[in-house]
A protein has these predicted regions:
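Active-site and donor-binding regions of nucleotide-sugar-utilizing enzymes
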Residues: 24-163
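Membrane-proximal basic amphipathic "stem/tether" segments
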Residues: 1-29
Length: 163
């Protein structure tokens, strides 16, 4: 059964890459769904069939016919997913993109971070936690100011910051 599941997930990842969806959300587990749900619902209504919800948690799904749910597990399959995924906009709540095991790839046009807490970007995250994102959905001016300050002092590429 494990071998069968592995190949089923592998096949699903390759299907996503062939489709090259407009919007893809990655979730580590179902506890993160509440933070992106409204964005997902809005995009699914506006772009039916173009929104994918990918999770490492088999129980993490969105009950919306316009959202395509895919379980990808973790470990090797998660690594394979992130190195091969081809999508226009990839939404995540994972920090430290490109600084940890999750690396950017050339097939993603726009890496988008959305917060799962209304906290300062300088208090609980690593200093480079958001450096490699293209777009960040911020909770307020304080996050925008903190990110812009870091971009300036570290001479980083400017991100699109949305409040």
């Amino acid at each position: 059964k494990k071998i069968k599941d592995f190949f089923f997930i592998f096949k699903n990842i390759n299907r996503i890459n062939q489709k090259k969806p407009k919007y893809l959300f990655y979730s580590e587990n179902k506890s993160y769904l509440k933070f992106g749900y409204l964005i997902i619902e809005y995009l699914a209504k506006k772009f039916p069939g173009e929104v994918y919800y990918i999770s490492s948690d088999v129980d993490d799904k969105i009950n919306n016919l316009d959202v395509i749910n895919v379980h990808i597990s973790s470990g090797f399959l998660l690594q394979y997913f992130f190195t091969s995924v081809s999508v226009e906009n990839l939404f995540m709540t994972l920090t430290d993109l490109n600084n940890s095991i999750i690396k950017k790839n050339k097939f993603v046009k726009n890496y988008i971070y959305y917060f799962h807490g209304a906290v300062s970007t300088t208090k609980i995250y690593t200093s480079a936690a958001f450096d490699n994102y293209d777009t960040i959905l911020c909770n307020g001016d304080y996050q925008i100011n903190e990110i812009q300050h870091r971009e300036k002092i570290e001479n980083l590429k400017k991100k699109k910051l949305i409040k």
